[in-house]
Swiss-Prot record:
Heme b b562 binds at residues 83, 182. The cytochrome bc1 complex contains 11 subunits: 3 respiratory subunits (MT-CYB, CYC1 and UQCRFS1), 2 core proteins (UQCRC1 and UQCRC2) and 6 low-molecular weight proteins (UQCRH/QCR6, UQCRB/QCR7, UQCRQ/QCR8, UQCR10/QCR9, UQCR11/QCR10 and a cleavage product of UQCRFS1). This cytochrome bc1 complex then forms a dimer. One of its GO terms (cellular component) is mitochondrial inner membrane. The lineage of its organism: Eukaryota, Metazoa, Chordata, Craniata, Vertebrata. The gene is MT-CYB. PANTHER family: CYTOCHROME B. Heme b b566 binds at residues 97, 196. SUPFAM superfamilies: a domain/subunit of cytochrome bc1 complex (Ubiquinol-cytochrome c reductase) (SSF81648), Transmembrane di-heme cytochromes (SSF81342). This is Cytochrome b. GO terms for biological process: mitochondrial electron transport, ubiquinol to cytochrome c. It comes from Spermophilus dauricus.
Length: 379
């Protein structure tokens, strides 16, 4: 009798994706983040579902409904903080996952990479709308500032913003629709994840050397399932340490004040994972220019396959490119720090220089260094 795992129409798909999948024998811990992102998505959907059972998307009661969840619902505080800090863990894994793709040249799988960038946009949109829901000061003003950016679009901008708001300011209609979108997007993300995996399994995984690994494959189970379980345990340990010891470490104290349209917080800033993009936005004095730079700072990821001029796929054997890559990482840390600082000297000029460096490294320095390395190979 043939194994049901290999014959059943549904189980067969799971088998080919997670059990008998041929995987390169040399993929490192940097390849763990795909499964960790899957876990983060599951955690967010489950905790989010339980939060939605008690949350009310009305401007009068939203803030107190979150308070009610934390005080009166059984383990409500745990669910709420797992959801809030789960988003931070999600983005840490996302950034590391994208960084891995850049370092090892995984972007040469065009379809997988482009779906991944679309996923990044979708997760960022979901996180932004989720941040608005508790209806604290930073929720309200963050929503006002970020949605207002669309007014920079010529001709249709103002109409577009009022259409998104559902009125002439961020109000009840805005909160209700943000809740609706925040609820539906994770399911759209899940569907996109399936497409992402579908494209990945068409080509097979990349590996640290960037070389074709068809001659040396091992089954995904048990080798990489056990490796993923280690990553999962470490992720849960980190998340629960954060949730149980300092749940507000990454949050903003201003969000414990109910939203007040008449009082602007001294420093409006988004959650930490958007700070690098926020710094790029602020570094350009022109509104439309800033918005374009903000969008392009993420969209530029789609250009990587076109900007890849090296004869080698991975950076494993390219020390010059490695140096530039880590300078780019340091630059992103700098931008994240600047995004959280007030708009004053010397932060303004540091932010502008870091923004210029970000685009210069990606569009100019990395391709040039790749060509120099190609020349060095001939010596």
């Amino acid at each position: 009798m043939t194994n049901i795992r290999k014959t059943h129409p549904l189980i067969k798909i799971i088998n080919h994706s997670f059990i008998d999948l041929p995987a390169p024998s040399n993929i490192s811990a940097w390849w763990n983040f795909g499964s960790l992102l899957g876990l983060c998505l599951i955690i967010q959907i489950i905790t989010g579902l339980f939060l939605a059972m008690h949350y009310t998307s009305d401007t009068m009661t939203a803030f107190s409904s979150v308070t009610h969840i934390c005080r009166d619902v059984n383990y409500g505080w745990l669910i709420r903080y797992m959801h809030a800090n789960g988003a931070s863990m999600f983005f840490i894994c996302l950034f590391l996952h994208v960084g891995r793709g850049l370092y090892y040249g995984s972007y040469n799988y065009f379809e997988t990479w482009n779906i991944g960038v679309i996923l990044l946009f979708a997760v960022m949109a979901t996180a932004f709308m989720g941040y608005v829901l508790p209806w604290g000061q930073m929720s309200f003003w963050g929503a006002t500032v970020i949605t207002n950016l669309l007014s920079a679009i010529p001709y249709i901008g103002t109409t577009l913003v009022e259409w998104i708001w559902g009125g002439f300011s961020v109000d009840k209609a805005t909160l209700t629709r943000f809740f609706a979108f925040h609820f539906i997007l994770p399911f759209i993300i899940t569907a996109l994840v399936v497409v992402h995996l579908l494209f990945l399994h068409e080509t097979g995984s990349n590996n640290p050397s960037g070389l074709i690994s068809d001659s040396d494959k091992i089954p995904f189970h048990p080798y990489y399932t056990i490796k993923d379980i280690l990553g999962i345990l470490l992720l849960i340990l980190t998340l629960m340490t954060l949730v149980l010891f300092s749940p507000d470490l990454l949050g903003d104290p201003d969000n414990y004040m109910p939203a007040n349209p008449l009082s602007t917080p001294p420093h409006i800033k988004p959650e930490w994972y958007f700070l690098f993009a926020y710094a790029i936005l602020r570094s350009i004095p022109n509104k439309l220019g800033g918005v374009l730079a903000l969008v392009f700072s993420i969209l530029i990821l789609m250009l990587f396959p076109l900007l890849h001029l090296s004869k080698q796929r991975s950076m494993m054997f390219r020390p010059l490119s490695q140096c530039i890559f880590w300078i780019l990482v340091a630059d992103l840390f700098t931008l994240t720090w600047i995004g959280g600082q007030p708009v004053e000297h010397p932060y303004i000029i540091i932010g502008q220089l870091a923004s210029i460096l970000y685009f210069t490294i990606i569009l100019l320095i990395l391709p040039t260094v790749s060509m120099i390395e190609n020349k060095l190979l001939k010596w």
